[in-house]
Amino acid sequence: MTLLENKTPASRLYFQLLKLLLLSVFVSASAIAAPVPTVMVTELQNGLDHPWSLAFLPDNEGILITERSGQLRLWQQGKPLSEPLKGVPAVYSKGQGGLLEVALSPKFAQDRRVYLSFAEEGKDGKAGTAVGYGRLNPQGTAVENFTVFFRQQPKLSTGNHFGGKLAFDKQGGLFITVGENNQRLTAQDLSLHQGKIVRLTPNGKVPKDNPFANQSPARPEIWSYGHRNPQGLALNPWSGVMWSNEHGPKGGDEINIPIAGKNYGWPLATHGVNYSGLPIPEAKGTHVDGTEQPVYYWEKSPGISGMAFYDAERFPAWHHSLFIGALAQKELIRLQLDGDKVVAEERLLGDRGERIRDVRIGPDGYIYLLTDESDGKLLKVGLATNN
């Protein structure tokens, strides 16, 4: 606070007394203010090979963890990390490719179905995103009868921008993010899967109400388009609407709410530039007619990845927050939400210096993270309490 002082002696004394009074009020307020909660981190597992995704099994069966090099493992409290589960598909593990997401069927208690996304090599040596499912055996040692039901067409990647995130909506629809394989204009071509979010039934069929289901040559699986490399996908538990995030180039990481049939701009609309610092050649600005604006974006890219909405009861200070991992800036980002608006941003765990790949809310109300390193970790994160 700045006080405008008169230069007479009497007024100087008045303002000095007023300053002392205000200072005492500020000190008293700070003395009774609630302390900032301390974030507590527990390392549950290390030695993981670039872990990418995790999924909680019910009834304390453990946590499934994918490693990008092609292994699916089972972590259980108090037990050694499992050997790789059998029945997992072969993967293209070059560059950003490999075994990517693991997700459970909404009816896992009945069907024990496990979904996996991965980079799959084609006949010409290039790769694309693929998704399939199999049945986790009762022993948790194998995925049986794995069947691929979605393949990105055509396969164009030489190791970049696969997407690969999976999430179910409340109606059971399966959303899949598909990167543009670092070939920008494919994201605007509806005859290609590149740079899209697709929606399928749990059995891999095209829902009749998909926006391009009867609009050949558009791919009927497409839900939304104009995406670069979507690395986060989560259902908003309060609105029941799917949210996604994606990497920009140099700047322009985004959070979006993908709506059926809408164009999210890449590469025509972007808040980023090329890694060289030069403009994106196809870009027409940050706001382009016919494209949707992000809910939130960063001018300097954190390298956002997995994300999760905090809807648990354990830590009230985190209610109505969206947590996102940051690969480049090596932090956990907390966004405070008011409806669909971001009203505050907080950075956590930056002192650890670890690339945070996946973020999940556990059934116990703690946040679980995977760090994308050759010695990757499974972390459990919470707030210190007086309880």
Task: Set out the residue ranges of the language-model regions.
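N-terminal secretory signal peptides that target proteins for export/translocation
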Residues: 1-15
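Conserved blade-ending motifs and adjacent loop-strand segments that build the rim/top face
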Residues: 343-363
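Beta-propeller blade signature
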Residues: 130-138, 190-202, 258
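Acidic, Gly/Ser/Thr-rich repeat motifs that build Ca2+-stabilized beta-propeller blades
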Residues: 33-184, 232-235, 240-248, 300-338, ...
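Surface-exposed loop and turn segments in beta-propeller and other repeat-based domains
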Residues: 85-95, 146-159, 202-223, 267-298
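Beta-strand initiation motifs
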Residues: 34-40, 79-83, 136-147, 205-219, ...
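Bacterial N-terminal signal peptides
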Residues: 16-29
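Short, conserved, GDST-rich strand-edge loop motifs in beta-rich repeat architectures
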Residues: 120, 176-194, 252-254, 258
